[in-house]
Amino acid sequence: MSAPEPKITPELIASHGLKPDEYQRILDLIGREPTFTELGIFSAMWNEHCSYKSSRIHLKGLPTKAPWVLQGPGENAGVIDIGDNQAVVFKMESHNHPSYIEPYQGATTGVGGILRDVFTMGARPIACLNALSFGDPSHPKTRHLVSGVVAGVGGYGNSFGVPTVGGQTRFHTRYDGNILVNAMAVGLADADKIFLAAASGVGMPIVYLGSKTGRDGMGGATMASAEFDEGSDEKRPTVQVGDPFAEKLLLEACLEIMAKDCVIAIQDMGAAGLTCSAVEMGAKGDLGVELDLDAVPTRETGMTAYEMMLSESQERMLMVLKPEKEKEAEEIFKKWGLDFAIVGYTTPTKRFVVKHGGQVKADLPIKELGDEAPLYDRPWVESPKLPVIHARDINAPMGAAEALEKLLATPDLCSKRWVWEQYDHVIGGNTVQRPGGDAAVVRIEDGPKGLALTVDVTPRYCEADPFEGGKQAVAEAYRNITAVGGKPLAITDNLNFGNPERPEIMGQLVGCLKGISEACIALDSPIVSGNVSLYNETSGRGILPTPSIGGVGVLDDFTKSATLAFKAEGEAILLIGETKGWLGQSVYLREICGREEGAPPPVDLAVEKRHGDVVRGMIHAGTATAVHDVSDGGLLVAIAEMAIAGNIGASLDAPPGETVSHAWWFGEDQARYVVTVKEADLLAVKTKLKTIGVPCTQIGVTGGHALKIEGERTVDLKALRHAHEHWLPDYMGGKN
């Protein structure tokens, strides 16, 4: 006999994240008081994490279509066609709240979840990336969080057998109480063998696959839809526990069963577990679903229907199976040592029915749970415009050489080698360009093609001007893919914001989305998948708006990709793009001048596209020997990174006479690249760029073992490398 269910009270409703008007909507919808299990189901499906109820109305404006897009948003991952019947499947997703509470497990299950999203579509994962945002280094929890998250990301990816090839790591005090862990996975599939989540056919068996269900992860999706407070550590039991070795078995079993043509529809059990996967499959297929929880494999005794429906135990899948393939499918999963259980059937009723112990625990309309969940048009206000900071109004407290050394040893600009060396970035043998460059390059087996992969966003720009910040995030992803020789094709996004019930926060989201949309259209890079993470606040203090952009591009010949390292002495250093010396929101202004203010640099998308096409053409023609986009830290930081990577110095000319020196070296004007060319090609390159109207300035020549800046003191490369490489390991070792 099952234990009596709790009485539905206002306190119980509130603890499930449901507001009074939402509960009233439930009463109106079903005409009675919900059962405890039904309350849990509504809580899971109507929370922000699963329903996107605050953002969905604005997401509809994003460009999602192109001739090469095979599957846009709405499925487990996006899919693009890269020719030769090959498709790239990719998505980015957050695991922010769990990673703050339990950094190792939060990060591992974030990686595991995004990998499942990719191989659920029928793709074999070939690469992972991430975007990590931590609090101020001086905060007492930051070092612990960095250590746990990085170990978790590496621990899962390394054990599963997928290389982690790139990403971002940043620090800012606004992430003190709410770090961000955004994970991206990329896979390859046959373009004509993509598997979707929509069920079809009445009476089809619904099969539970993978690991057993436990009580870990209870209420995880609801936790991810709420602000933190001082008692957040008490939510540790809601963090899931991952097993990468079980996931590897699940991957191989799923790909084998797909190859045997057993699958009608398949969905991974991620947020809200069995509830979300079953509802989505039925709702997308315009069918009902009936589940018998007595058949669910469990690893704990006495689990209730509520617990089984809301558990977020990892490494699980739900599949609608072709009936005639039942025995064959079961044999495959048993071979891999995984659970295989028929737990229900599709029905024509459009109802979601859950049975346990011979009793009906839930009987709800499935469409209203799924794709017809509440939709809010929340009030929003536009972010106020900040004044433009003029370079001549900023006094330089030190020379360019000294400022460069200081900047290279700051948390955001220092080398992240300590992070990525903990990841196996070459497992599989297809990594062409490792972390540390503009974009990762991964070879596609059995051919010359490669993929260029990157993750980008500049949150301080997004806070200062959400529209320009949204544009810039897409533009930088475009530049980074271009800088390695890739043709940008599509984007996945991960929108991390604070409390959407505050109009100023909602305004940030709306502004960023408008900027992202405009940039995607101009740069011909549709958004094919994504994730929204709201309520990233602690005690009323929100994070910086952080719309992470994951970019994917293709190279026809991966052997012709470019890198940022200087290749030889005596090569001309060219700056492509115009420099006005934009210091507003720059790293220089913050770290050297102690000011975090002003309007961010504007983004001219037509110029971005024109300059990108030119640089890509130079790479393909073989005239560009090294390429690096200019972003955080400005021109001199970009040159220093190229010199350090190639172990070759440079002699640099003084800034043009009309330019303020520190603005020339450290301004963060957009649409710029540093390119090196051989002396023999220099005249032809400069002539061509002048003819087509693309700004090109020769700013120096490679050579030696130092940076020699006209009018400044010389800086030895060893000193620059020490500054660049030592800050993070020293910090993690407690030395600073």
Curated annotation (Swiss-Prot):
Residues holding ATP: Y52, K91, D493, G530
GO molecular function, one term: ATP binding
Residues reported in the UniProt entry to bind Mg(2+) 2: D117, D268
EC class of the enzyme, as a word: ligase
Domain of life of the source: Bacteria
The enzyme's E.C. designation: 6.3.5.3
Residues of the active site: H49, H95 (proton acceptor)
Alphabetized UniProt keyword annotations: ATP-binding, Cytoplasm, Ligase, Magnesium, Metal-binding, Nucleotide-binding, Purine biosynthesis
Pathway: Purine metabolism; IMP biosynthesis via de novo pathway; 5-amino-1-(5-phospho-D-ribosyl)imidazole from N(2)-formyl-N(1)-(5-phospho-D-ribosyl)glycinamide: step 1/2
Biological process terms in GO annotation: 'de novo' IMP biosynthetic process
Pfam families attached to this UniProt entry: AIRS (PF00586), AIRS_C (PF02769), FGAR-AT_linker (PF18072)
Reaction catalysis annotation: N(2)-formyl-N(1)-(5-phospho-beta-D-ribosyl)glycinamide + L-glutamine + ATP + H2O = 2-formamido-N(1)-(5-O-phospho-beta-D-ribosyl)acetamidine + L-glutamate + ADP + phosphate + H(+)
Location of the protein in the cell: Cytoplasm
One cellular component term from this protein's GO annotations in UniProt: cytoplasm
Function: Part of the phosphoribosylformylglycinamidine synthase complex involved in the purines biosynthetic pathway. Catalyzes the ATP-dependent conversion of formylglycinamide ribonucleotide (FGAR) and glutamine to yield formylglycinamidine ribonucleotide (FGAM) and glutamate. The FGAM synthase complex is composed of three subunits. PurQ produces an ammonia molecule by converting glutamine to glutamate. PurL transfers the ammonia molecule to FGAR to form FGAM in an ATP-dependent manner.
Assembly and binders: Monomer. Part of the FGAM synthase complex composed of 1 PurL, 1 PurQ and 2 PurS subunits.
Protein name: Phosphoribosylformylglycinamidine synthase subunit PurL
Organism: Rhodopseudomonas palustris (strain TIE-1)
Gene: purL
